[in-house]
Amino acid sequence: LIGSTLEHEGFDKTTTHAALGSLKASAIELLPELANAEPIAQWAGLRPGSPEGIPFIGPLAGFDGLWLNCGHYRNGLVLAPASCQLLTDLLLGRPPIINPAPYSPVGRLHC
């Protein structure tokens, strides 16, 4: 498994030769023995984010029982422990670890 890229292509998940070339060059720089290796597969996905760059964490108004924890853009893995703790605290009615207001979908997400 070698790295990741970021391309602003809307909802197009097509892989590109440019991205593959960049990833391969980075891998060879770190481990020259990979120079003759050929990729087995290439994959592309989406990195959904919010317009403000702040994830949506909390209940979605108008949809009883629907809670969100999304919109982390490229920081999903890094923020997962804290955002899941916040969501868990909110769901269970416990005092949250941080102020949940900035993350609330209320007033920020319109369905």
Place the predicted regions along the sequence by residue.
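C-terminal lid/capping helical subdomain adjacent to the catalytic/cofactor pocket in oxidative enzymes
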Residues: 60-111
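Active-site lid/adjacent beta-loop-alpha segment flanking the redox-cofactor pocket in flavoenzymes
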Residues: 1-63
